[in-house]
Amino acid sequence: MRRIIGFVTMFFLAVTVVFGKSQENVIDITFNKLGAVYHKNESGNAVCKVIKANNDITYEVVVEIVDIDKKPIGYKKTYTLSSPFERYYYVPFQFSELGYYYLSVSFLHGDKVIFSKQEGFGVIPDVTLTKKDYDSPFGVGAHYARYGDWRVAEIQQALGIAWVRDVARWKDFIGTARNTPDPFIDYLDRHNICWLPILDYVDANHGWRDENGIWRWDEDVTNIKKYVEMNENRILVYESQNEPSNFAGWNKRWPHPQGQKWRPQGWGVPFTDLVKQMHDSIKAVNGDIKLIWPGEEEWIEYFDDNREDVANHIDFTAIHPYILWRKYPETSPFYDGFYKIQKEMLKKRNIPTEIWVTETGWTTYLPDSIRRHFPPVTEYQQAQYLVRNYLVQLYFGAGKMFWYELVEEPFGVHHPESGFGILRYNTMLTVKPAAVAFANMVNNYRYLKPIGKYLAKDRKTYGFIYENEKESGAPVLSIWREADEKEELIPVKYTKSLTEIGRAHV
């Protein structure tokens, strides 16, 4: 792939290769900094613990740092040891180049690698959030409470990701007399992170039908209103519910006639009644608070066609554009006119045309014999697609985007949900290449405004032209190939801008 300004997509993961018995070989690599993410010229270090249990065999232990191309960068130490042994090696480092690197430790007997382990770490620009950036389009989905590790906000802050989409646990406050905000808000405030709260699921089975044929959730809606009152001056946008087609019993109580649970014919009418009631109760607290409706496929049309006064209850909508088996961001319908068509539909129905992407992502799970909805990608591809997807969707009409998700989940290496995260689910929450790519994207694109699409001669070359909202100067061009490499001849009017336009990262 041509490596052009503006996006840094890095390489491979920490990989363990075992040829002997795992219980006889121990390699632990621990970085001195949470997330294993460092700034340029920042001093860092790691401690490598190595244990070999076999007796009377001599090994070479090789400790080395390599770059994203697996090329040595100058640090390599070799130790000759007779087993059994337990050693600790201190590895200092400092880098002036942005990138994704990994520290490798190997046991060798003769010329044969008996056991090895690699752990990745990142060097990023200083994009640390020093204040809340509500205007930033860059967000990430997360399950902070599920992780059970509240250090994770420190890493998000360092990566410069301004927004987090996470559950608002209004049910936890039922029956309390609390008149202060949800403590999660204070926690995020300390890290200058903006919160998009998804109101926790309303159980479909709680609904009942009144004499006018309207489905009601009075108790749940009242409790949601109390929760919003707690946070009145701290949160001004909520997401109503997450994927009613999949959760909270909606498609079970009101199934689609042909079993197509994603489609709203069945659960759509009672769900519309619920969200309208949620909207009214929230507006009663503060008319400036916005409530996002889920807007997948024909959902909005169905809601609006089958219930009265729906348009007046929609502040704006959200979508979850996963690419599924069409692998590349540019081969999705979102590159070919979706936003234009969707916004024309919304405008025709007098519904605000703002659209947020509240979930999108690619997963690095390991495929098995079961065919799943999501195509597995390498960590290198995940990093590439993250940046390309943000650039594509933000250009064509997304207001904000939230990558799914921040941390990998412990569901097993063959489960797609385990691989969406950009941080590893380990004791140090170490960065994957996609996290480094995200930080570089924030650094390069936060204040770039798209002003045009690059018209390439080859259909598999893509790009956009930007102007900087904060600095005057010539436009910035960002281009890339779908999957391969190819030279592109670019006419440039201002040759003095070539240094900036042509600077290659990855």
Model-inferred region functions:
Residues 362-439, 454-459:
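Aromatic/acidic polysaccharide-binding cleft in carbohydrate-active enzymes
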Residues 454-499:
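Carbohydrate-binding surface patches
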Residues 501-506:
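Conserved small/polar residues in nucleotide/adenosyl-binding loops
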Residues 141, 273-302, 348-366, 398-409:
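Aromatic-lined carbohydrate-recognition surfaces of secreted/lumenal glycan-active proteins
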Residues 20-159:
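Mature N-terminal, pre-catalytic/accessory segment of carbohydrate-active enzymes
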Residues 140, 144-173, 183-187, 193-196:
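Catalytic domains of carbohydrate-active enzymes, especially glycoside hydrolases
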Residues 136-142, 164-166, 195-199, 236-240, ...:
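Hydrophobic faces of well-ordered beta-strands that scaffold small-molecule active sites
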Residues 147, 177-179, 205-341, 367-388, ...:
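Active-site cleft segment of glycoside hydrolase catalytic domains centered on the general acid/base Glu
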